[in-house]
Amino acid sequence: MSEYSLFTSESVSEGHPDKIADQISDAVLDAIIAQDKHARVAVETLVKTGVAIVAGEVTTSAWVDLEQIVRDVICDIGYTSSDVGFDGATCGVMNIIGKQSPDINQGVDRAKPEDQGAGDQGLMFGYASNETEVLMPAPITFSHQLVQRQAEARKSGLLPWLRPDAKSQVTCRYEGGKVVGIDAVVLSTQHNPEVSYSDLREGVMELIVKHVLPAELLSKDTQFHINPTGQFIIGGPVGDCGLTGRKIIVDSYGGMARHGGGAFSGKDPSKVDRSAAYAGRYVAKNIVAAGLAERCEIQVSYAIGVAQPTSISLNTFGTGKISDDKIIKLVREVFDLRPYAITTMLDLLHPMYQETAAYGHFGRAPQTKTVGDDTFTTFTWEKTDRADTLRAAAGL
């Protein structure tokens, strides 16, 4: 981080229209994968006033009640009345899902599972930094925490005048690659019309901002912009059209690391846009956890229908304890980055994805979860269970 003195990242709440779309896409994926672990799923969602449109390509033996899934997601987020601008119980739901192209399928499936080809060409990045306990950049971590707290305060009734749509933005100050302060905080939250601006600002500052952000990083010079337009009553899909895959920087590292451009939500693990990005995070986090570097960004690329990555590259930004070339060699020895191996290594064939679709795919704690008869661990790419192996192999 020494190249920056200030760095800013943003996040959005689960009620943001693009995040509604992401959550619907991943809820559909979860429902299918719960019944058919070998399904091929690529689901896109659009939400706008009074309607949700679900499209894409799915090949599966499962049957799911897509309309009910869509309605449940919208209502669970908090859009349950036309008063807030969107009602999951009464909105229109359009299903225009087709089957996956056999041309793609023949390039992915193999007689030997380990030879499974990548579902598409592409490049993916993984990143980790030791600036927070979760080995994520601080600006995106704080931004996620703000909108998570907004949802918590709304759903618990702590701030009953809050509505689902919200956005956050945090600017951190760095010295010598370390976070030394927070320069600016932006939090815009949808709200009921009857609340005064003074009450809203006080409630948000005391029960959201100060509850989340470390006091030692705030100062008299920190700028706080709470609903800077003064009013945010119209929000959600009424205010803006929502689309799956339009918040890829929020989903990843807040702009601190590069992004290959492929979105995550709605895609089963055969799509390397998702699974290889998760593997990249797993590799980078274990490198940092092992003490091989303070920061690490890894790039991996694939060709459609080919199992082995076409390239693996890595940058520790001058923070490595050993050379980047040596770390790449260790990565190739310790991690198998073929698509099937990633799916096996991270145990990805479970209905774990809706939870990833809001508040970031990275920096989240693995949890044990049970769906029906299936018990599994979520956010497996956040484990640091290969750090000791890397450290030993590096001779540290």
UniProtKB/Swiss-Prot annotation:
Binding annotation for K(+): E44
InterPro entries with a match to the protein in the record: ADOMET_SYNTHASE_CS (IPR022631), S-AdoMet_synt_C (IPR022630), S-AdoMet_synt_central (IPR022629), S-AdoMet_synt_N (IPR022628), S-AdoMet_synthetase (IPR002133), S-AdoMet_synthetase_sfam (IPR022636)
Signal peptide (UniProt feature, chain positions): none
Record's cofactor remark: Binds 2 divalent ions per subunit. Binds 1 potassium ion per subunit.
PROSITE patterns documented for this protein: ADOMET_SYNTHASE_1, ADOMET_SYNTHASE_2
Annotated GO CC locations: cytoplasm
An MF annotation (GO) of this entry: ATP binding
Main location (coarse class): cytoplasm
Gene3D superfamilies in alphabetical order: 3.30.300.10
Enzyme class, first EC level, given as a word: transferase
Positions with a binding annotation for L-methionine: E57, Q100, D240, K271
Pathway membership, UniProt: Amino-acid biosynthesis; S-adenosyl-L-methionine biosynthesis; S-adenosyl-L-methionine from L-methionine: step 1/1
Flexible loop: region residues: 100-110
Cofactor: Mg(2+); K(+)
EC number of this enzyme: 2.5.1.6
Binding site for ATP: H16, D165, A166, K167, D240, R246, K247, A263, K267
Residue numbers binding Mg(2+): D18
Compartments in which it is found: Cytoplasm
Gene Ontology terms: biological process: one-carbon metabolic process; S-adenosylmethionine biosynthetic process
UniProt subunit comment: Homotetramer; dimer of dimers.
NCBIfam families: metK
Cited HAMAP family: S_AdoMet_synth1
Sequence similarity: Belongs to the AdoMet synthase family.
Described function: Catalyzes the formation of S-adenosylmethionine (AdoMet) from methionine and ATP. The overall synthetic reaction is composed of two sequential steps, AdoMet formation and the subsequent tripolyphosphate hydrolysis which occurs prior to release of AdoMet from the enzyme.
Protein name stated in the entry: S-adenosylmethionine synthase
